[in-house]
């Protein structure tokens, strides 16, 4: 029978709160991806490292309610609340997708008190690339 390896120190670390809470981020980029089924809001620093994120699904909305403007507004508010506490004052906004939550998420970002340097639509548009899926017959 092998001998157990002795543990040095305790199993729990002495850290209280999250590891990323210590960073001060004065400027960031807010990415909003609004599809017809869900809205995902990701906040990164200027180098592209994710600081905070939220989606309509993680906010408790299920099924078709995830694609609603109110769900997008709630997701944007949740993602931004944490970075405002970390000291973010200025942000750029990149909006992608055709979903219903585009305007609602942008409205929630504007109301958060962040100074927006610009808002850019980065929805990918094909230059006659792949063939689209066939139309639904209901």
From Swiss-Prot:
Disulfide bonds: none annotated. SUPFAM superfamilies: Translational machinery components. This is Small ribosomal subunit protein uS11c. The keyword RNA-binding applies. Part of the 30S ribosomal subunit. Keywords: Chloroplast, Plastid, Ribonucleoprotein, Ribosomal protein, RNA-binding, rRNA-binding. Belongs to the universal ribosomal protein uS11 family. GO terms for cellular component: chloroplast; ribonucleoprotein complex; ribosome. The lineage of its organism: Eukaryota, Viridiplantae, Streptophyta, Embryophyta, Tracheophyta.
């Amino acid at each position: 029978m092998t001998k157990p390896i002795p543990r040095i120190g305790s199993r729990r670390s002495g850290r209280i709160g999250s590891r990323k809470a210590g960073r001060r981020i004065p400027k960031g980029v807010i990415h909003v991806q609004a599809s017809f089924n869900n809205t995902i809001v990701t906040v990164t620093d200027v180098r592209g490292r994710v600081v905070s994120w939220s989606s309509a699904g993680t906010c408790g909305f299920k099924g078709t309610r995830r694609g609603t403007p109110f769900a997008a507004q709630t997701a944007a508010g949740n993602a931004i609340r944490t970075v405002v506490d970390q000291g973010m004052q200025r942000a750029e906004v990149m909006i992608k997708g055709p979903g219903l939550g585009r305007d609602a998420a942008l409205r929630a970002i504007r109301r958060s008190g962040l100074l927006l340097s610009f808002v850019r639509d980065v929805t990918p548009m094909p230059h006659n690339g792949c063939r689209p899926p066939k139309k639904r017959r209901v």
